[in-house]
Amino acid sequence: MALHATYLGANGWLLEFGELRVLVDPWLTGPLEFPPGAWFFRGELPQERPAPLPVDLLVLTQGLPDHCHPASLALLPPTTPVVGSPAAVARARALGFSELTALAHGARHCHEQLQLTASAGAPVPQLENGYLFDHPEGRIYLEPHGFLDPTLPEQPLDAVITPVVDLGLPVVGAFVKGQQVLPQLVQRFKPLAVLVSTTGGEVRFEGALNRLLWLKGSLEAAAAVLPEGCRLIDSRAGERYLLKQHQPSTAGASAGGAKAGTAAG
């Protein structure tokens, strides 16, 4: 068995903990718009994608449309279990999903062998969620805006999914703090891999708001922060990354030979 992560562009991920498939914040089809309309902010995908079915669990960090995208969520069966922030769960309920769990900060939810812990995330403006995924196949921390809950204890993780640059607006300041948070994430979790999120996928943006955005940081600056032994993965939309693989036991390898090795992959 193994731990895999497939980047879907923007904030979207498919996390595979062995055979358990967890979809996070998918934007797969159609445009992305923020009120009051396209003139203010509009995003278009370079390539639309089908829903990566089957999905065992849908996890939503925020209720905003770039995390809780109506047209993309409509591609999923309404019986798909949903875990999310209170704002995200309210959106999912309005879209017809029926098996819903809203997690407050610090609350936990178990789905099969996966334990999901909600952490305080980005204030947009209500405080949304980050998540700690804990499964026998691996452990991941994910927060899409570069915010780290100070109450999360130090613990070794297999991977951290985070932006690595800051994005902001004049007067408002940074609302994505990837560059600022990366050293804290590395110190807190000592991850074996950091997967770049949020700002990837070659999405095309336009509108009045987009023209005001500023960016600070780079992949090169992020790589310089990471300690030896920690991989920086410049995530590409559609790519599936192997983060951890359990080796078969000596007894199993000798009994099963090549077959056991194939099953592990």
Where are these regions (language model features)?
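Zn-dependent metallo-beta-lactamase
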Residues: M1-E44, P191, L209-N210, G217, ...
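Pre-active-site segment of Zn-dependent metallo-hydrolases
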Residues: L20-V59, P70-S72, F147-P153
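Active-site neighborhood of phospho(di)ester-bond hydrolases with catalytic His/Asp-centered motifs
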Residues: V24-D25, V55-C68, V83-S85, Y141-G146, ...
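Active-site environment of divalent metal-dependent phosphoester hydrolases
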Residues: P31, G63-C68, V89-R91, A107-C110, ...
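Metal-dependent catalytic neighborhoods of phosphoester/phosphodiester hydrolases
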Residues: P70-P77, F205-R211
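Metallo-beta-lactamase
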Residues: G84-E137, I233-A251
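Binuclear metal-ion centers of metallo-dependent hydrolases, dominated by the metallo-beta-lactamase
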Residues: G96-G106, P153-P156, P170-V171, Q179-G265
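Active-site-proximal loop/helix segments of hydrolase catalytic cores
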Residues: A122-R188
